[in-house]
Every structure is written in C-alpha cells, then in structure tokens.
Regions:
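A conserved amphipathic terminal alpha-helix motif
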Residues: 105-138
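Solvent-exposed, flexible loop/coil residues
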Residues: 13, 33, 42, 58, ...
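Hydrophobic ligand-binding cavity/cleft-lining segments
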Residues: 1-43, 96-99
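Hydrophobic-ligand binding "helix-grip"
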Residues: 27-28, 53-99, 105-107
Length: 138
C-alpha cells in the first residue's frame, strides 16, 4: 500500500531536515512513538529503531536510512511487522520555506498486523507529518 504526504513548513531547509533526521528525538514529539533510538550511524547511513504503541498494540521496527544531507532520507525495513516497508523523505526549499514530502510503501506480514496497524497507518502518517510541522514551528 502506498501513502504519500506533504507539508509546507515556514522554516529553512537545514532546520527542518535536522528535525526529521534526529530519530532519537522522535519519542519526544511523534504520536504513538514510545521509544526511538539510533543504533548506528556511519557516513550517509543510519540504522534506527522505533517502538510504537498503536491502539494498545506495542510493536517496533528497525530501518536502514540512507541520508542525503538536506535533500532526502531513504528508509528500508530491516526488521518489523511488515513484509516490506520502504519510505522516503524529500526536502525542497523555496525562500526560507521548506516543503517536505513523505512516501511510504508497505505490506503487513499478516492479517492481524494489517488490521491493527495497516488500517491506521494513513492516520498515523498524517499525524507524523503534522508532528514534524509543529516541532519545526516551535
């Protein structure tokens, strides 16, 4: 299933990119995220893990993120409740305003996961983007 979101943030690209790229701070402002950590970071690659609680269901997933500074972050599932999950953040700056684009393509491992998480993922993704907008505007 493919989900696409975008938002305009009245902040410069560097500030917005740094907020999105600081996975270890997600637990402080991202809905449903109860723990977030960077497991490793080297050159343009980051391994990150998120623990989520969605409708009382706790789950976690780990991604390998290819970071192109101030341009994009490509995410690929390493471990989690999905058969696959690929995502991409893209950043575009226009006169000290940043447009963020988030694309997530995923398939749940089974019907229980699809029911519990999949049906909510569209709302979760919207909440996620709104959380980044709010955090950037602080």
């Amino acid at each position: 299933m493919l989900i696409k979101k975008e938002a305009i943030i009245l902040r410069d690209l560097e500030a917005v990119f740094n907020i999105v790229n600081r996975v270890d701070f997600y637990k402080n402002f991202v809905p449903y995220c109860i723990e977030s950590e960077i497991l490793s970071e080297e050159n343009e690659q980051m391994i990150a893990k998120l623990n989520l609680n969605i409708k009382g269901l706790s789950t976690s997933f780990t991604t390998k993120n290819l970071v192109k500074k101030y341009s994009s972050i490509d995410m690929q599932l390493i471990e989690g409740p999905f058969k696959y999950l690929d995502g991409k953040w893209e950043f575009k700056e226009i006169e000290n305003t940043t447009i963020i684009f988030l694309t997530i393509d995923y398939k749940a491992k089974n019907k229980l996961v699809e029911y519990a998480i999949g049906k909510s993922l569209e709302k979760i993704t919207t909440s996620l983007v709104h959380a980044f907008v709010k955090e950037a505007n602080k």
